[in-house]
Amino acid sequence: MAAGAGAGGGGGEGDSNGGGTSPGGVSAAAPAIGPHHLGVAAAEEAMWQMTLGGGESMESTPYPERIGEPDCSYYMRTGLCRFGMTCKFNHPPNRKLAVAAARMNGEYPYRVGQPECQYYLKTGTCKFGATCKFHHPREKAALANRVQLNVLGYPMRPNEKECAYYLRTGQCKFASTCKFHHPQPSNTMVAVRNSMYSPGQSATSPGQHTYPGAVTNWTLSRSASFIASPRWPGHSGYAQVIVPQGLVQVPGWNPYAAQMGSSSPDDQQRTPVTTQYYGSRQSETGGMGDHGMYQSYQGGSVPVGVYTVQGENIFPERPDQPECQFYMKTGDCKFGAVCKFHHPKERLVPAPNCALNSLGLPLRPGEPVCTFYSRYGICKFGPNCKFDHPMGTLMYGSATSPRGDVSSMHYQLSPSPGHPGILLDGGSGRSHRVPQSDSQQIPSGDGNAEREAS
């Protein structure tokens, strides 16, 4: 009996040591694992995983909850605090709920002794909410909401730097929350902005803007205010929408009128004669037939020599800096008021050595057609462009002009220095030069009448 007990005891000791053998070397069977052992192991594993995960609902970290004290910013961001129970700030049990409540109520942490949140002082808001580590004085935030807005809805802060993006593009994605200064738009920008509106409409009031055409009315829906940027003016003389068939007639428009001024006061008083512009269709009452042709300008309508920017100059004048070469060539500058070079109001531009069409663009029959002009009807290089700008390129989608009538596509030129006549192309591949005295009397009929006049 004692031996049996000893054997049993040896078996128990061996089992406890994990060997499973008796001291005598006789192998003993391991005891079976019951279902209760599996349940205990699973529960321990689940508790271990929850401890590692640090679940929000099972937090038992020793962080003090101090009602009335500012929230611990590090704890609110990460859920941890290295100071533990010695931290003097508040640690709410459910920090996610506390952050959401602070954002909904518009409450921001009041941390006396910390630097003031500059973004909160200027805009009255803070994107970090309750997690911001700076001080948010509520009495100063009320003054931030009283900032004056310009006509476009952007804040004017005279004591701050000017918004560089706003000066270049006329827009600001931060809107009223931008911390920089947004001055009132210049007269030139407002004038260009209002150039496409009728006298009875306002450029700043949203709504429907109808442009009467010769065939149909084109209504443009506008849901936001636009400003003419120095490079690509919005709602300006440049048509930004391709209009099918029902084309638009804009009286008294020249795409280069605001950019180029005549050097002679007498030339400024001369006006074009019954001019049809890009995107317009010839009226049935006109004397040019149904071909949608362009009447030539009177003498002196195309400026040469000294080009001046009319109205207020939106580009900076820096006499002690080199001249902006791009501005001297095109009259435009994509950097706007932040450009570091000199932009003189009067710039000497060499007179083009070719004839110009009624839009002020050069006609170079031997050169390739300007790709940008053929697509959009404009050219930023103006009379200095080295490519050809034929008027026939603009005459697309004409339902009244037969396809085979090629003779109706001809150049209409305005006289320029060194070119006493007007070059006509009757569609036969030959060019004819007409004296200036006879060019004003050329009837706009078929190609035969033009050849007889030459």
UniProtKB/Swiss-Prot annotation:
MF annotations from Gene Ontology: DNA binding; mRNA binding; zinc ion binding
Keyword set includes Metal-binding: yes
Biased composition (Polar residues): 434-443
Keywords assigned by UniProt, alphabetized: DNA-binding, Metal-binding, Repeat, Zinc, Zinc-finger
Domain of life: Eukaryota
Region listing for Disordered, in residue ranges: 1-30, 405-454
SMART domains listed in its UniProt record: ZnF_C3H1
Zinc finger motifs (C3H1-type), residue ranges: 66-94, 111-139, 157-185, 318-346, 364-392
Compositional bias ranges of the Gly residues kind: 1-23
DNA damage is among the record's keywords: no
Protein name: Zinc finger CCCH domain-containing protein 66
Species whose genome carries this gene: Oryza sativa subsp. japonica (Rice)
